[in-house]
């Protein structure tokens, strides 16, 4: 079914209230259409500024990647976490929006390879994050 993304910042606030030492909350947003067709995105919430950013965006509107013909869902979350950690620790990704954009693109592409290791290059991830905003991934 459809996700009500407007509620996810509230979920992140509840997590932050329970775990006082965290600065950010990241949540992946998966809409399962079928076993091989998912819509995929994420939210990154900053505790101190009480702001949330979503990815991918089409202008000001959240528009999840439409992943058809999923090869393997295993590793999608790990790939998101790895992409987010990489982006947060690399000076090229200065904003929370840049960071979550990269992480979501990395995890989206991970759905196109077998197993839980993301073989995609940084250039491939950035091409998706910066390129086709229609939300359709073709591999």
Model region roles, listed by residue range:
Residues 1-139:
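Conserved phosphate-binding/catalytic region of the ribokinase-like
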């Amino acid at each position: 079914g459809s996700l009500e993304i407007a509620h996810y910042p509230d979920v992140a606030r509840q997590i932050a209230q329970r775990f006082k030492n965290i600065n950010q909350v990241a949540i992946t947003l998966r809409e399962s259409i079928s076993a091989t067709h998912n819509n995929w995105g994420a939210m990154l919430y900053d505790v101190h500024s009480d702001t949330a950013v979503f990815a991918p965006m089409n202008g000001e509107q959240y528009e999840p990647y439409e992943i058809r013909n999923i090869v393997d869902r295993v590793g999608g979350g790990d790939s998101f976490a790895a992409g987010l950690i990489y982006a947060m620790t690399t000076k090229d990704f200065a904003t929370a929006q840049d960071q979550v954009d990269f992480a979501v693109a990395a995890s989206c592409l991970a759905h196109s390879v077998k197993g839980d290791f993301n073989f995609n290059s940084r250039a491939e991830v950035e091409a998706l994050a910066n390129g086709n905003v229609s939300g359709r991934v073709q591999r």
